[in-house]
């Protein structure tokens, strides 16, 4: 069985550590939206919706080649009150004793439960159930033909398959592989850790890790 983001079987994360202010603000909005899911998406058929968020936070590691760009990003974080903290690579073990500081010049993280990851399947079902209760109709089937529709804006819900329906829209699937890893030591409180020097990330999942 293929695991795809479009099918709700992939990894879905919630963060505010972006470079652009617009993305930071979107991250802040999504946090409030997710916190209100139990009340805002409650329905008769789904009285207790949840996204099962794990608020372990984000830890991003930067080598000398990426550090300057991240220092600029931190100015936007501060302006947007993103709650991001910054430490030197040499200080890493004071906060995260299980992280190697080798090759790391600086690191940013959050420790106020504002970042983490969610269950995409539960979130999708909560949105779908609420839409149905509000009158939306879901029809299963394949698109066989298209006709011209005049509109100021169109939202494609076809995900990575958009190009199969609308050839002039440059949206294509991109492979993203996630591995489940077993390690001798389990650190359940570990944040999602992204090493920008290697492109590798990892986070706890149950008693294992996803990477």
Predicted regions and their residues:
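Glycine-rich nucleotide phosphate-binding loop and flanking beta-alpha elements
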Residues: 67-68, 124, 145, 161-163
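Dinucleotide-binding Rossmann-like beta1-alpha1 core, especially the glycine-rich loop
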Residues: 14-95, 199-201
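Single conserved hydrophobic/aromatic residue that forms the stacking wall/gate
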Residues: 2-13
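Helical element adjacent to the flavin cofactor pocket in flavoenzyme catalytic cores
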Residues: 110-144, 149-152, 157
């Amino acid at each position: 069985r293929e695991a795809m983001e479009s099918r709700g079987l992939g990894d879905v994360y919630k963060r505010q550590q972006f470079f652009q202010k617009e993305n930071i603000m979107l991250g802040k909005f999504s946090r409030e939206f997710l916190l209100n899911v139990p009340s805002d998406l409650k329905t008769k058929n789904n009285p207790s919706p949840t996204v099962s968020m794990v608020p372990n936070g984000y830890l991003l590691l930067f080598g000398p080649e990426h550090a300057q760009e991240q220092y600029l990003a931190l100015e936007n974080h501060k302006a947007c009150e993103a709650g991001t903290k910054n430490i030197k690579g040499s200080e890493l073990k004071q906060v995260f004793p299980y992280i190697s500081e080798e090759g790391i010049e600086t690191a940013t993280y959050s420790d106020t439960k504002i970042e983490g990851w969610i269950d995409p399947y539960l979130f999708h079902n909560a949105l779908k159930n609420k839409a149905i209760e509000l009158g939306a109709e879901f029809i299963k089937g394949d698109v066989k033909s298209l006709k011209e529709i005049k509109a100021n804006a169109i939202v494609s819900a076809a995900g990575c398959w958009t190009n199969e329906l609308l050839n002039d829209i440059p949206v294509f699937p991109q492979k993203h592989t996630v591995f489940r890893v077993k390690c001798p030591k389990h650190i359940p409180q570990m944040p999602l850790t992204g090493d920008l020097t290697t492109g590798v990330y990892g986070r706890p999942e149950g008693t294992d890790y996803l990477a």
